[in-house]
Amino acid sequence: MGRSISVSFGLLVVFLSLSGTGADFDCPSGWSAYDQHCYQAVDEPKSWADAEKFCTEQANGGHLVSIDSKKEANFVAELVSQNIKETRRTDFVWIGLRVEDKRQQCSSEWSDGSSINYQNWIEAESKKCLGLEKQTRYRKWVNLNCGQPYRFTCEI
């Protein structure tokens, strides 16, 4: 009997130590959790700059989404597909990346300051801001005019 109690206690310790690994990660109401971050697809068209401003005002550390892996890209694509209403203006969704210099070279970081570790370009053009394209089920990045109003995804 003493052995089964110590085994049960050991399993309880393992369970409690694993419970803090992200399964219980809390996000504000209306946000979705993925890999220790919170995401919100916003169904209100704004220019890239206004969308970035909106995201920074939502929560401390908020920005337009930065996509660091294929898994995160798939999560964001599903989030957008499920939360953005189908209209003529849903062909594109802003992400937090834009061209910063005059030679149209991509900036070396996302709007949140993180490095670019993953890329999924559909084509290179002379427009400065990037978004996800509906035709690719929101999985490929396309250059867009920064002043155009599109839906967007915030991340904290």
Curated annotation (Swiss-Prot):
Keywords carried by this UniProt record: Disulfide bond, Hemostasis impairing toxin, Secreted, Signal, Toxin
Subunit structure: Heterodimer; disulfide-linked.
Disulfide bond entries: C27-C38, C55-C154, C129-C146
SUPFAM superfamilies (UniProt xref): C-type lectin-like
Disulfide bond keyword on record: yes
Organism expressing this protein natively: Macrovipera lebetinus (Levantine viper)
Stated family: Belongs to the snaclec family.
Highest taxon in the source lineage: Eukaryota
Subcellular location: Secreted
Database matches in SMART domains: CLECT
Known role: Interferes with one step of hemostasis (modulation of platelet aggregation, or coagulation cascade, for example).
Name by which UniProt lists this protein: Snaclec A11
Signal peptide limits: 1-23
